[in-house]
Amino acid sequence: MLRIIDTETCGLQGGIVEIASVDVVDGKIVNPMSHLVRPDRPISPQAMAIHRITEAMVADKPWIEDVIPQYYGSEWYVAHNASFDRRVLPDMPGEWICTMKLSRRLWPGIKYSNMALYKSRKLSVQTPAGLHHHRALYDCYITAALLIDIMQTSGWTADQMVDITGRPALLTTFTFGKYRGKPVSEVAERDPGYLRWLFNNLD
């Protein structure tokens, strides 16, 4: 069983306002769970515009420390951009898998947000009624569908996905400089001197 976790926050620095999870068991999405959470700071207007969770909606909700034990119980936790969720959550007893890192390994060059990958891979999943993208439970279903696709495409085991998640991300496409948007492999063939220059000028 792999447990997909998603959080919505007060902003990029954290402050959880919502947590949710679903489990993937034998390729099926089961056991949905979600909680609104009272944050430890004000919700930024930018974050509120994205997830539409207001101060009034969370004012009387429990703290994250009070609800997080309900999300324990898996050997593996999965998130899209797992480093963010790991940073804002209390410690979770298990290994972490990042679908963003796995997707970059499998499909370099595709936009890496979970919704962009979901659409480009032409995936389909029944999401909860009344929710929308950037609500935690909705996004858990999107990430779960992506995880199932990754596992079916790659054949990777959970432990292999943990290993890949722990490795430094490989640059497959230049995001800077005169070759911005070009695959590294193409530049290596056409202009190997540029790669040598880059390596020699790394700080």
Q: Which ranges hold each PLM region?
A:
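CheY-like receiver
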Residues: 67-71
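Short, surface-exposed, low-complexity cationic segments
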Residues: 186-203
